[in-house]
Structures are given as C-alpha cells and as structure tokens.
C-alpha cells in the first residue's frame, strides 16, 4: 500500500510540473495572441473611420477625388501608348551594326574650281555688286566733268554698263586661260593676258 501511494504521489507531482511548464508556454502564446488582437482592433478602427468618412463625404467630392486619382493613371497610359507607337514606327536596327566614323568628304582643289566654273556658267546674275560699280562709274565721269557740269546716271544705264563690262572681262579671262593651257600651264600669268589683248587688237 505504501509503495502504491508513493507512486501515485510521484505521478501527481510529475503531472503538476508538466502543467506548470505548459502554463508558462501558454502564457507566452497568450501574450502573442493579445498583441495580434490589439493590432486587428486598430486596423478595424482605421477601416471604420475611413468608411465613416466616405459615408459623410458628398458625391461631388467623391467624384473629384476619383477624377484626381484617375487623371494621372490615364495620362500614364496615354504616354505609354504613344511611346509604343513611336517604337513601332521606328525602323528596326540590326543588332550587330557597328558605328563607323565617317570621314569628312574632301574635294581636290581642281574639282572645286570646276564646280565653281560650271555654277557660274549656268547663272545669269551679275558678279560685281551694283553700288561699288555705280560709285566707280561716277568717279570716272567726275574726272572728265566740272562741278557745274556733273553727269547724272539712270539706274538702267549703269546696269547696261555693268552688263557690258562683265561680258568683256569674262571673254578676256576666257582667252587668257586658253593661252595658259596652250603654254602647258594651269596658272594664268600676266603675259597671257597681254598676248590675248594683242591678238584681239587691244594694245596695252
């Protein structure tokens, strides 16, 4: 009997010890549960406040808020659509294209001279500016007239003189260039112009 009583007491003590340990674990679990409950209550309170605000806000204000929220989203969607269209419109570049630095195109001096000759042969415009030519004509005529007898020029008369003088100069330079080429030279020299004037019958 004594042995059975001692074994029962030992079992009871062990059970109490286990219960105490379980109580301690349960206390930590209970603390966590309380924290979670408090957080949930706070969230519910916040949600209720937001719902109360939306209830008491008039419909016009709600629409304004919705429009303010919707406008940036619509603008972003439009911008995205425009970017996609631009990308689709661009021609697709090959992936393995290497950018090669282009060298500036350089012409020889002879090519540039030939281009200028062709351009001036096609054009019919006057090469000498009008005002300096008119001043030169007036200076020359003033040398042969007195102060009382100054000559006056019409604009068409000065223009006719300019046309004639430019035609003469162009013809003389053309013959001078031909004589330089005949002498197996490219550079025009003074003696070429003298010979051209002598052949024409115009002595220096």
Swiss-Prot record:
Q: How is it modified after translation?
A: Ubiquitinated. Is degraded through ubiquitin-mediated proteolysis when not protected by its association to the kinetochore.
- Indicate where this protein is primarily found: nucleus
Note the superkingdom of the native organism.
Eukaryota
Q: Per the record, which residues fall in region H3-like?
A: 89-202
Question: Mind telling me which Gene3D superfamilies this protein's record contains?
Answer: Histone, subunit A
User: Region (Disordered): which ranges?
Assistant: 68-107
What family is it from? Answer: Belongs to the histone H3 family.
PANTHER family, sorted? HISTONE H3.2
Q: What is this protein called in UniProt?
A: Histone H3-like centromeric protein CSE4
